[in-house]
Amino acid sequence: MNMLESNILELVKDCRLIGISGHENPDGDCVGSCCAMAMYLRKAMPDAEIRVYLEEFDEALVRCIPGAESVRHDLPESGEVFDAFIALDSTPDRMGPVSHFFDSASVKINIDHHVTNSGCGTYNYINGKASSACELVYELMDPDQIDAGIAQALYTGIVTDTGVFQYPSTGEKTMCAAGHLMRYGFDFSAIIREVFFERTPVNARMLGTALLKSQFLEDGRFMLCVLNREDMAAYGAGRRDLDGISAQMVLTKGVDCAVFAHEDEAGVWRASMRSIGIVDVARTASLLGGGGHVRAAGCTIRTSITEALGILKKDIEEQLRSADGHELR
């Protein structure tokens, strides 16, 4: 694996068409890192064409991340070849159809902080101990070339993936980066409020529904909720109206691990997992082809939801009981 050590601009200085993308169902870190990188490259390479491709994302991110309004939600034209393609906060198998254009690019750059990523680019910058992709992108940038827009995009991503600096991956480097970015004068408190704490009425109702329908397993240490399309249709909810539910579930007293699964479309389910101490949810998610971090992970389920939940429950229960010194029956 070629580790990215030089200035990223050196790797793409001769490129005329550069693509940027991240994982499916993009969150603030994914959108923030992609938009910040695009602004940075456009500033340094005004003659190059820089395109960001992502699935649609929360409107709050459009309002809080400069450049998010120009992200493309379509795909490049068939047969189009990029001089360079940058995969941020992701690996190609989590990028959806756009991964083909990453694979065919002359220069492939992968920047990620997920522990399950071993690097998939011509050049890679992978650090599973970093708080966010935005923290890694910040490390690769020339501080003198960061402006207010880039700073706000990076800060928003860091805030999102650290849960406002509360998750264990938050470190000294994270706080130093955030402190430097705050010097650019954007309204950081408004970003935290809008991106992390505010809920729409539909989101609030779906959170209430999820909490009411949750099961408590393993003496209350494992909280599980499954919502189908009928549950969502009752309030006209879409995927974006379910943001933050697993993070709220794991805050319940006595809970170490929370799993929230919802039916995204007929036969396709998405599971979001959170842990605070014992359970390695990245390990659990990997059993179904997903990934993430020790304390936050997820997966897409295209097989029987009953069988998939059985696999997840068995692994989580096994981890909890192993910590107690008991074998899983």
Where are these regions (language model features)?
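Short alpha-helices
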Residues: 111-177
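Short, hinge-like loop/turn segments at secondary-structure boundaries
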Residues: 67-71, 104, 126-129, 276-277
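Glycine-rich, phosphate-binding/catalytic loops in enzymes
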Residues: 37-38, 102-105, 126-127, 176
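Hydrophobic helix-and-loop "lid/oligomerization" segment in the mid-to-C-terminal part
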Residues: 2-24, 32-63, 73, 77-82, ...
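Short glycine-/acidic-enriched loop or helix-start segments at secondary-structure transitions
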Residues: 30-31, 62, 95-98, 120, ...
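Solvent-exposed alpha-helices and their adjacent loops that cap or buttress functional pockets
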Residues: 77-80, 100-103, 117-118, 146-147, ...
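Active-site cofactor/cluster-binding pocket
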Residues: 70-123
